[in-house]
Swiss-Prot record:
Belongs to the oligoribonuclease family. The active site is at Y127. PANTHER family: OLIGORIBONUCLEASE, MITOCHONDRIAL (PTHR11046:SF0). 3'-to-5' exoribonuclease specific for small oligoribonucleotides. Residues 196-215 are annotated as: Disordered. This is Oligoribonuclease. InterPro entries: Exonuclease_RNaseT/DNA_pol3, Oligoribonuclease, RNaseH-like_sf, RNaseH_sf. It comes from Mycobacterium sp. (strain KMS). The gene is orn. The keyword Hydrolase applies.
Length: 215
C-alpha cells in the first residue's frame, strides 16, 4: 500500500442509494503527513429538475444556501465524465490502482454512491478506508477534552471545502490524540503486546468467568 491518501467528498440529493443522486464530487490527494498534492478537483454533475424538486426541505435549504442547486442545473457534466475527471486527477498522483485508501468523514456513505455510480473509480481505490469520524468518536469516549476542544468547523456544505475541513480535523487529532513520532520505544511496544496476551485471551477469560459458580 502506498502512503498517499485519496480524500473524496460527495454531495447528493439525499442519502438513499435507491433513489437519490450524486450531484457533486471533489477529490484531493495528500501524502502521509497530510500535505495536499496538487490543486484538487471539484465537479458539479447535472441532475434533472424532478430529482432536485424531490429533495427533502433540509437538503433543499442546504444546497440552495451553498449555491449548489443552481450550479447543478447549469452543469453539462454527466456521471461518466465526472468519473473520468476524478480518475485523471488521482492517477496523476497515485500511479498504481488499489494502493491508496479512501479518506474522509463518514466516508462509507460517499463510497456507497461511488460504488453505485462510478465503478471504475471505486475499483481504483484500495478497499481500506480512513474515516476521520471514527477517530472523533473514539476521542469523545477516551479524550473528551480533545473532542470538545476541536477547532470549529465551517458550514459550507460543498464537497471541496468539506475535504479541507476533514484534513484539518485529522491534523488536529494527530497532534492531540496520537503519540508523537517516532512513537513508543521497542521495549514499551513489546511490553504492551505482552500485557494484551495472545489472540482470544479476553474471550477465554470471559468464558471462564461465565462458567464459574460459587457454592
Amino acid at each position: 500500500m502506498r502512503d498517499e491518501l485519496v480524500w473524496i467528498d460527495c454531495e447528493m440529493t439525499g442519502l438513499d442509494l435507491r433513489s437519490d443522486l450524486l450531484i457533486e464530487i471533489a477529490v484531493l490527494v495528500t501524502d502521509a503527513d497530510l500535505n495536499i498534492l496538487g490543486d484538487g478537483l471539484d465537479v458539479v454533475i447535472h441532475a434533472p429538475d424532478e430529482a432536485l424538486d424531490a429533495m427533502i426541505p433540509v437538503v433543499t435549504e442546504m444546497h440552495t444556501r451553498s449555491g449548489l442547486i443552481e450550479e447543478v442545473r447549469a452543469s453539462t457534466v454527466d456521471l461518466a465524465t465526472a468519473e473520468e475527471m476524478v480518475l485523471d486527477y488521482i492517477r496523476g498522483h497515485v500511479k498504481q490502482a488499489k494502493t491508496a485508501p479512501l479518506a474522509g468523514n463518514s466516508i462509507a456513505t460517499d463510497r456507497g454512491f461511488i460504488a453505485r455510480d462510478m465503478a471504475k473509480l471505486d475499483d481504483y481505490l484500495h478497499y481500506r478506508m480512513i474515516d476521520v469520524s471514527s477517530i472523533k468518536e473514539l476521542c469523545r469516549r477516551w479524550y473528551p477534552r480533545i473532542y470538545f476542544g476541536q477547532p470549529e468547523k465551517g458550514l459550507a456544505h460543498r464537497a471541496l471545502a468539506d475535504i479541507h475541513e476533514s484534513i484539518r480535523e485529522l491534523k488536529y487529532y494527530r497532534q492531540t490524540a496520537f503519540v508523537a513520532p517516532p512513537g513508543p520505544s521497542t521495549s514499551d511496544i513489546a511490553a504492551i503486546a505482552a500485557e494484551l496476551g495472545p489472540p482470544g485471551k479476553d474471550a477465554a477469560d470471559t468464558d471462564s468467568a461465565a462458567g464459574h459458580t460459587t457454592g
